[in-house]
Amino acid sequence: KNYQVGSVIVRALRSVSINIEKNEYVAIMGPSGSGKSTLMNLLGCLDTPTGGTYILNGTDVSKMEDDYLAEIRNKEIGFVFQTFNLLPRYTALENVTLPLIYAGVPKAEREALAIETLHHVGLGDRMTHKPNELSGGQRQRVAIARALVNKPSIILADEPTGNLDSKTSLDIMGLLDEIHRNGNTVILVTHEEDIANHAARIIRLLDGTVHQDYINEKYKQKVVS
C-alpha cells in the first residue's frame, strides 16, 4: 500500500502476504510506523491496496467500489476501536442499533437484536444510559455489542484496551476470548505483549513488512491448562 504525501511516495506496506483462516485469533504487533494501522484498514475494507489482491471470504475486494465495500463492512466485519466511537447523544441501545439501521433491518427486529446483544455483553441494565453515564469498560462493551449485533464473521479490534485500566482490560479481553470461542475470527492490533498473548497467532510488522508470523506458545499453554 502506497500513499502520496506531497511529491513523496510513502510505501506503508511492502510485499505483505498473509493468510488468515476462519475462526483464527490473530494479534498484529509492531512499533509506530510499522504499518499496523494500514494493514488493519485494508483488512477492514476501509481502504484498498495499491497493488496485489485481498480475498475476503472467497471474494476479491481489492478493486471494489466504495458502496460495495460499505456493504461488506456492514455485513461481514465488526469494528472495536480504542476510543469506542460511540455517538454521545445516543443511548447504549441506540448506538448498538445503528449497524442494523444501515442494514435495513425493521425497527422491532433491530431493537430485539440490540437488546439481546447488550445482555450478552453484560449491559442489560445499562441500555438507556448515554456514553457519558458509563465507565470506560462499559463503553467498550457497548462498542463490542455494536460490533457483534449484525452477526459478522470477523471482529477487528484496534487497541481495544488502550484507554482502560488493567482490570477492565482483562474483562474486555475475556469477552473477546469468548467471542472467538463462539466461532468468530478475531484480529486485534496491539502494542501490549500481555494483550497479544490472548491470540493464538502473532504477526509482527516492521517497516511495512511482515517481520515475524508465528504460533503463540503462551496461548497453546493456556489452552492446555
Identify the residue ranges that each predicted region occupies.
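Conserved beta-strand-loop-alpha-helix hinge in the C-terminal portion
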Residues: 209-225
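ABC family nucleotide-binding domain
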Residues: 1-205
